[in-house]
C-alpha cells in the first residue's frame, strides 16, 4: 500500500512539470489522437475499394480515393512534424525546469548533506538522469496515445470485420500483455541499478580528475585508472544484465509479430475455405494486423525509454524528498547593518557520533579580534561553520547583536560574514568575476579599490587582460599567495560586519605572508574578527585568545596572560618556537 502511495505521489510530481506547457501538451495529445485516427483510415479505404469500387471498375472513384488518401498522408506528415518539434522543445524545457529545481534544492542543503553524498553521484543526477527524463516527457504521451488508439482501434475494427479472428487476436494480445508486464518489472529494477552504477562511475571519475595533481605527484595514474575500470566493470555487468532482458523482450515481440501474421494467414485461409470471411475482408484484416504490430514494436522501444526515464526520475524524486536540515523561519528577519557582537550559549555539536563541541559558551564584543587555537580536530573551524549556519548545533544558541541567528534569513546572515579560508576556491572565470562574486552591479572603482586594499592589484595589472584575465580551474594559473589575495579582495568588497579567517596564511611562506598580513590588517580594521590560526604573528594581535581542548574552552586571555598561566597555550607556544629555531638552524 505504501509503495503504491509513493508511486502515486511520484507520478503526481512528474505530471506537475507539464503545467507551464499545458497548451503544448494538449496539442501533442490532440495531434497524437489525429495521427492515430489517420493511421486507422487507410485499411478502411482499401476494404471499400476492394469490395465496391474494383468490382464496378470505377477508376474515377479509385483515383479520387487515392487523391484523398494522399491529402491525408500530407496532413499526417505535417502533424507529425509539428508534434515532434513542439514535443522536443517541451521536453528540453521540462528537463531544464527539473535541473533548475534539483540544483536549487541541492544548494539549499546543509553541509551535512554534502558530507554524506558524493559530488559525482549528484552530478550524475543533474545530468544523465535528467536527460533520460526529458526525452520521456515528450515520447511518453505521444507514443502511449498513438499506440493505444491504434491498437484499440484495430482490435475494435477486427472484431467488427470478423468476430472469430478478432477473438483469437484478442487472446494472443492478452497473453502478450501479461508477458510484457512481467518483463517490465524486471527491466525497471535493472535500469534502476544501471543508473546507480553510472553515478558511481561519475563519482570516481570526478574524484580522480579533481585530484589529478596529487595523482600525478604520487605516480598513481594506473591505480586510479584501475579503480575507475573496476567501477566501470561493475556498471557494465549491470548493463549486460539489463541488455539480456531488453534483448529477450525485443526478440519476443518480433516472434509475436511473425507468429501473429502466420496465425492470421492460416486461420484466415481456413475461414475463407469455410466461407466465413470474404477475400477483401481478409486482405483488410491482414493490413490491420500489420497496423496493430507497428505500435507494438514502437512500445518495445518506448518501454526501454520509459524504464530508463522513470529510473532517473525516481533518483531525482528521491533527492527532492530530502528536506533541508536548515530552513529559514517563516518570520525570518533580514540581517543588516550589524555591529558584530557574537555570543555562543552552551553550544554542543557532533559529527555523527563524534562530539566535537561540548557546552561551549563565550562572548565577543563588536569590533573585537579573537583567536581560536588548539590541536587539529578540536572544533575551531566548526565554530565558524556554526556561526555561518552551515550546520545546526545539537543544542545551545548562537546570537549576533543579541538576536538568535535562527531568526535571520540565511542569505542575509551570510552576506554579513566574510570568510577567508586556507583552501581558497576560485571559479574558472576572470579575475573580475571572482572578486565581484555574489555581488551585483559592482562599479569598477570599488572592485579596483578592494584589489588594492588586498595588495592584489600589483599582480593583476601584470596579467594579459588584467581584470578580465581567465585564471583557469580553481585559479590554477595563479600562485597560492595570489589566490589568497583575491579571496581577501572578495571579502573587502563584500564589506561584512564580521570576518572569519580560517587558517588564512598557514600554507604561505613568510614573504608572502607579510603581504597577506597587511591586506588582512586592512580587512579586519574596525570589524569583529575571528581568527583560526597557528601562526604566532596572527594570534599575537588578537584582543583575546580562546584555547580549545576536548570540546571545551580550557583557557582564555591575551597572549601575555596565557603565557603567564603556563598551561596548554604556553606549551603549544614553546613547541612552535622550538620548531622555528630548528628550521632557522
Give residue ranges: language-model regions.
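Membrane-integrated ABC transporters
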Residues: 1-39, 54-65, 83-91, 98, ...
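Transmembrane helices of ABC transporter permease
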Residues: 20, 24-34, 68-72, 139-192, ...
